[in-house]
Amino acid sequence: MNGINDKSMNNEALIERIVLNRKKALKQKGKKSTEGLEKPVAFWIKRDRLLNEIGKEFTIILRTRGCDWALGKTGGCSMCGYIQDSYKDTVPPENILSQFNFALESKRHEIEHDNNNYILKIFNSGSFFDEREIDKNLRTSLYNIIADIPKIKEVVVESRIEYIDRKKLEEMKTHLKDKYIEIGIGLETVNDYIRNNYINKGISFKEFQEAFELCKEYEVGVKAYLLFKPPFLNETGAIEDCTNSIRTLINMGINSISINPINIQRGSLVEYLWFQKRYRPPWYYSLFTCLKNAVKQEDLENVRILCDPSGAGTKRGIHNCLKKDCNGHMKNILENFVLNQDVRELYNDEFNCSCKLKYKLKNAYL
């Protein structure tokens, strides 16, 4: 036993359960009003790691129709509940542009008068290059606005690989000129079986590699999202899987790796398992073991390692025990590691909580 749950699940049964949970959650949510389409889901500024320095991120979450993978017959990924933030119907491009401008004008003065450089992250709970979410003309309008903001040095968007093509990469590079571009892709793991039978991602590692090589041709970076502790893995399996994924991606020359410990999102299969006490979000101890095993200081000269867990320290997010001091300490160490890109930060764990023994015993006997 390698720590990965040997009980394989029929993919059709997995999809059926994902779709059922999704429909139930969306029905309870009801139809969204058109009144909210002029403003984004959320936007914020906070400290973040840029390629070669500590700066700030300006994140905008746009409300679009949502992820086509989640809206389709497959029901989407087993851990994802972001479809509940979407409109689930076509959002006119002018509304999406208004959302972007609303966020930008709210923060423009702060950005322009800040000494820090910025990374702009545009998320839309789906794929930036999916024409049904964000069409070509809208993308061009966004590029032209961004190009005129000198403080923004890096731009990150997200997309499933089937929407990434030469034309879209060329357009983005042409309009954004000297800004560093990175495309976030939800790979989740380099293991095809786990990705498609436990997560229901619907892509192969080979397809990811092809997308990476295509982006490299256009000098566009790729940020691979890795899921830490997918459903049906225990802590040991999660450590093994993510360690292997990190090493594989580093060796292939990936630009950035963003490790995402699962947080329990509403309407997801993972929430269904969590309610049944068949899933627990990962421990910080497991994440730190993975990072210590997988990342060497010399790796960080060429690869950016990121990790900003949602719901950290709560029952639904990565946590040890639920003591504030314990989780707060681990969170601070993780933040310092990411900001400084220095593995020595991971060993700054002089805080010893009694829950560490409980964690070790659980891992030894489960």
PLM regions with names:
Residues 56-60, 118-122, 155-157, 181-185, ...:
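Hydrophobic faces of well-ordered beta-strands that scaffold small-molecule active sites
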Residues 1-32, 36-39, 264-366:
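Auxiliary Fe-S-binding modules of radical SAM enzymes
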Residues 91-106, 134-145, 203-208, 238-246, ...:
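Well-ordered, non-membrane alpha-helical segments in soluble/globular domains
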Residues 83-103, 107-136, 149-165, 180-207, ...:
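Core AdoMet radical
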